[in-house]
């Protein structure tokens, strides 16, 4: 039987996973919008990059949701829930390519920071699989921060 502290830790892990699931869903939506609306001399490069990133975001949404189910949690699954649980926004004010890229840098930095928190919670809960999942995500996210920041100059 789980102790009260273990149940609390498990709930914290599940809540944090739902926040990240929601962040990745909003990021997926934002990336689609950027993919469709990017304009300017870097259209072809960014159009392709945004597609690559939204494909990765879609995979990440599925991976986090399945991890939640595997540990007995319930992933949020509606747009309303995603919006309520996310710590990033869906934006909407970005019109230039550089504004779009800067918004992504900011979102990825937020996700990276919060993912480190998830790792700590998972490790406290002896949930090595969740911790490992987020270690891998941080590696990819930090790479994207570097690449997108380099684009901005």
Curated annotation (Swiss-Prot):
The name under which this protein is listed is Metalloregulation DNA-binding stress protein
Q: Which organism is it from?
A: Bacillus subtilis (strain 168)
Q: Does the keyword DNA-binding apply?
A: yes
- Domain of life, per UniProt, equals Bacteria
Question: Mind listing the GO molecular function terms for this protein?
Answer: DNA binding; ferric iron binding; oxidoreductase activity, acting on metal ions
State the function annotated in the UniProt record.
Answer: Forms highly stable, multimeric protein-DNA complexes which accumulate in stationary-phase cells and protect against oxidative killing.
Alphabetical list of InterPro entries matching this protein:
DPS_DNA-bd, DPS_DNA-bd_CS, Ferritin-like, Ferritin-like_SF, Ferritin_DPS_dom
Keyword Coiled coil among UniProt keywords: no
CDD domains tied to this protein: DPS
Please spell out the taxonomic lineage of the organism that makes this protein: Bacteria, Bacillati, Bacillota, Bacilli, Bacillales
- Family membership, please give it: Belongs to the Dps family.
Induction (UniProt): By oxidative stress and by growth in minimal medium lacking iron (Fe(3+)), or one of the divalent cations manganese, copper or cobalt.
PROSITE patterns cross-referenced by the UniProt entry: DPS_1, DPS_2
One Pfam family matching this protein: Ferritin
Keywords (alphabetical) are: DNA-binding, Stress response
């Amino acid at each position: 039987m789980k102790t009260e502290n273990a149940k609390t830790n498990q709930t914290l892990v599940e809540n944090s996973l739902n926040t990240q699931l929601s962040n990745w869903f909003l990021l997926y939506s934002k990336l689609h919008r950027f993919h469709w609306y990017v304009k300017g001399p870097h259209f072809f490069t960014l159009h392709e990059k945004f597609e690559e990133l939204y494909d990765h975001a879609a995979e990440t949404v599925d991976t986090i949701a399945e991890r939640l189910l595997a540990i007995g949690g319930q992933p949020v699954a509606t747009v309303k829930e995603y919006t309520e649980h996310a710590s990033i926004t869906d934006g909407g004010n970005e019109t230039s390519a550089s504004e779009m890229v800067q918004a992504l840098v900011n979102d990825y930095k937020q996700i990276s920071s919060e993912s480190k928190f998830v790792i700590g919670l998972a490790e406290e809960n002896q949930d090595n699989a969740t911790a490992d999942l987020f270690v891998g995500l941080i590696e990819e996210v930090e790479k994207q921060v570097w690449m997108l920041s380099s684009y901005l100059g």
